[in-house]
Amino acid sequence: MFEKFTNRAKQVIKLAKKEAQRLNHNYLGTEHILLGLLKLGQGVAVNVLRTLGVDFDTAKHEVERLIGYGPEIQVCGDPALTGRVKKSFESANEEAALLEHNYVGTEHLLLGILNQSDGVALQVLENLHVDPKEIRKEILKELETFNLQLPPSSSITPRNTNSSSSSKSSSPLGGHTLGGDKPEKLSALKAYGYDLTEMFKESRLDPVIGRSAEVERLILILCRRRKNNPVLVGEAGVGKTAIVEGLAQKIVSGEVPEALRKKRLITLDLALMIAGTKYRGQFEERIKAVMDEVRKHGNILLFIDELHTIVGAGAAEGAIDASHILKPALARGEIQCIGATTLDEYRKHIEKDAALERRFQKIVVQPPSVDETVEILRGLKKKYEEHHNVFITDEALVAAAKLSDQYVHGRFLPDKAIDLLDEAGARVRVNTMGQPSDLVRLEAEIEKTKQAKEQAIGTQEYEKAASLRDEEKKLREKLGNMKQQWESNKEEHQVPVDEEAVAQVVSVQTGIPAARLTEAESEKLLTLETTLQKKVIGQSQAVASICRAIRRSRTGIKDPNRPMGSFLFLGPTGVGKTLLAQQIAIEMFGGEDSLIQVDMSEYMEKFAATKMMGSPPGYVGHEEGGHLTEQVRRRPYCVVLFDEIEKAHPDIMDLMLQILEQGRLTDSFGRKIDFRNTIIIMTSNLGADLIRKSGEIGFGLRSHMDYAVIKEKIDAAVKKHLKPEFINRLDESVIFKPLEKEALSEIIHLEINKLGSRLQNYQMDLNIPDSVISFLVTKGHSPEMGARPLRRVVEQYLEDPLAEMLLKESCRQEARKLRARLTEERVVFEREEEAVSALAIEGDGSEPITADES
C-alpha cells in the first residue's frame, strides 16, 4: 500500500500518528491525516488548503471540538489504522492511477480522505465552510501550474459516481470542470514569481533606508520610452536587491511618478521555472506564458535577481536560452525588466552578449559609507530586536559599521555590518537567555513520572498509574506557570547588545582582538618591554621600538590604513633579530604559529615574486595562490618576518611598497589581502662587515658616540642597497648592537635553564657555578658570530657528557643532583651529595666523564 508513497506522504503519516498520540487516541483516523497534511507545511495539498483559508491551528481546534481528547490511560505503541483510513489510502492510490501519476503524494492523500463521505476530516472541512469540490478544483489547478501531464478528461472516471454520471462528467476530480469546458489556468506570474509590492504591503520585507540616488536613477530609467530596463551592478552584499525593494516601498507609498504608480513589482524565480522541465519546449513554454501575461496586464515590472543566469538558462542541444527569448520583447518595450548581478558576472556573461547588454541600462551600486551604514542599521534595528528579544544600543550600531569596515575583509558594507549585528544579538540571546535550571529539573521530573506511569500501566498497577497521572498533571501545571512567568520576565527585561558584544563577534570571526582593553591586557602591554627583554638579551632599543608600535595599535591611535608597525632590523648575525620577532608572536599574537617567516634567499630570481602573491592565470600553480598572501588571508593578525632581505632580487622589494604604505597587497586572483593588522619586520646583515672591521669600536660599544658612528656607517650601507622610497615607508630602522660579555653570560644562563628543564624528565638537577659559565662565555666569545657559538659550546661542554651519563644504566635508578666543576679546561660532572663523579661506580676507581672524553 505504501510502496508508491513519496517521502512527504510518509512524513504526513508520521505526523498524523503524533497528532493521534497528542490527542490520546489509540487509532489513526482521517482527521489525523488532515492534521498531518497541514502540519507538514509544504506540498500541493498544503498549498491548496491554505489557498482556501484552512491552516493547522484552525483545523486542530475544530478536531478537538468535534472529538476531543481520549482517556489518559492508554496502550503504548503506534495507533491502529481505522477502516476509513485504509480505504482513503486505497482511494489515494486509485486517484494517482487515474491521473497517470506513478507516485502517491500529499495531493492524492487529500483526495483520498475527501472520498470518505462519512469521515471526520470531511466533516471538519465542511464545518470550516470549505467545499470539497473547490478543493478538487484547486488541486487540479496546482498540478497544471507545474506542467504535470494530466490525462485526457475522457479517460478519467470520477470517484463515488455511477456509470451514468460518469458519462455526463469526465473531470478527473469528481466531475467538476474548471470554469466551463476549458480548464482555467493559474497565473504564471503567481506560479513562478513573488510580488514584492504585495509583500511590502504585508510588512514581510525589511524597510529600506537611504539609497535615494540609486532608487531615483532606477525610476528615471523605468520612465524612459526605449531601453527602459535597468540593471544594478555591484559587489555582493552592497544592497542591490534592497534597492529594488526600496522601489517597491515607494510604489506602495505612492512616492513615484504617475507612470509607475499602479505598477506591480514581481521577482521572477528562474530556478523554479526550470525545475521539473523534462521535455524540450516546456521551459520555453513557461517563459512565453510569463511574457504573455506581462503583455496582457501591462502594469508588471519583472525583477530578475542574478541576471547573468538567463544566459544559457534552459539551453540544450539546439535550443535557445532565456536571454534569446527575452531579447525581442525587451527591445520592443513589450516587457520591462530590472536585473541585478555582480561586476564579475556582468563582465563574464552580459558584456559578452552585446545585443543583450544594450537592452539594459547599467547602474553601478557602490558600497555605502560607514555613516550611511549606521543609518541603514538604525532602520533595521527594530526587526533584529524583535527577533532576538534584545535591546540594541546605538553604540552597537556604530561599532558594527566601523569594526566591520576595519576588520572584516573580502566582503562589503552594509552586508557585513548587518551580519555582525545579527550574530551579536544571537550571541547575547544564547548566553543570557538559557532556560532556568528550575525548569530543566522540573521537565526531567515530569519525564521520570511519565515513565513510571507507563511502567505501572504495563504491570497493570492501575491505582499507582492513576496516582502518577495526577502527580504528572500537577507538575505540568506548575511547569506551565513557571514557563509563563519566565517568558514574561524575558519580555520585560531585555538584555542590551552593546559595543563590547559586537567587538567580541569580530574577535571570534577574525582572530583580531577588537574588544576594549581589559585591565589585565593593559597591564600586559605596559610590562611587555620588560617581558621581552628577559628573552631578548642586550637589545633594549629594538624591544622598545616594537613595544611602542603594539601599544599604538591596541589603543587605536595608529594610522588605520597602514600596518601596525614596519621595522628594518640591522646588525651583525646572531644578535637576536629573528628571536625578537618570534618572542613578539608568542607574547602578543597567541603563539609562534602567528609568525609568518619568509626566507628572502628563496627570492633571488626576479620571477620568484610569483611565489609570494601567486602565479598569473594560465601558469602552473595559479590555483594554489601565493605563499605569503594565502597565509596572511587566513591569519590577518600576525607578525610577518622577511628574513635577510638583502638576498632577494631588488625588483621583488618593490612589491612591499604598497604593503608598507597602504597595508594591502593584491594577489593573483585580484583579491586585496589586508596587512593592516600585521607587524612587518625585515632583517638584514647590511653593514655587518663594518662592525667587524671597525677598529674604533671593537667588541662591545661603550659610549653613545660609538653607537652613533656605527649607526651612520650602517645607514650609509642601507641607502646604497635599498631604494629611498622603500626606506621612507619604514616606521623605524633599528640597529642591533654587538653583544657584550655580560649579555652573553645571561644568554648562557637561559640556555642552561632550557637544558635543566629537559633534564627534569630524567630526575636530574644541574648546578652550574659562575666559574663554569665564565669558561663557556670565553669559549663561545666571537664578535663576528654573535650568540650562536654559545649553542655549540653548550652542546660540546654540557650536553655531550650528560647524554653519555643518561646512557649508563646505573644513572637512571634514582634522583640525583649534579654539580659541574671546571678542571683543566674541562667540565666535570659530580654528584653534589658525595662530591664524586656522577659516572663513577662507588669503589671502582673510575674517572669522571669530562667534555673532552665525550
Swiss-Prot record:
Residues 81-145 are annotated as: Repeat 2. CDD domains: AAA, RecA-like_ClpB_Hsp104-like. Residues 151-182 are annotated as: Disordered. Coiled coil: none annotated. Residues 2-145 form the Clp R domain. InterPro entries: AAA+_ATPase, ATPase_AAA_core, Clp_ATPase_C, Clp_N_dom_sf, Clp_R_dom, ClpA/B, ClpA/ClpB_AAA_lid, ClpA_ClpB. Keywords: ATP-binding, Chaperone, Nucleotide-binding, Repeat. ATP binds at residues 234-241, 571-578. Residues 151-172 have a biased composition (Low complexity). Residues 443-478 form the UVR domain. It comes from the Bacteria. Residues 5-70 are annotated as: Repeat 1. GO terms for molecular function: ATP binding; ATP hydrolysis activity. It holds the Pfam family ClpB_D2-small. Belongs to the ClpA/ClpB family. ClpC subfamily. This is Probable ATP-dependent Clp protease ATP-binding subunit.
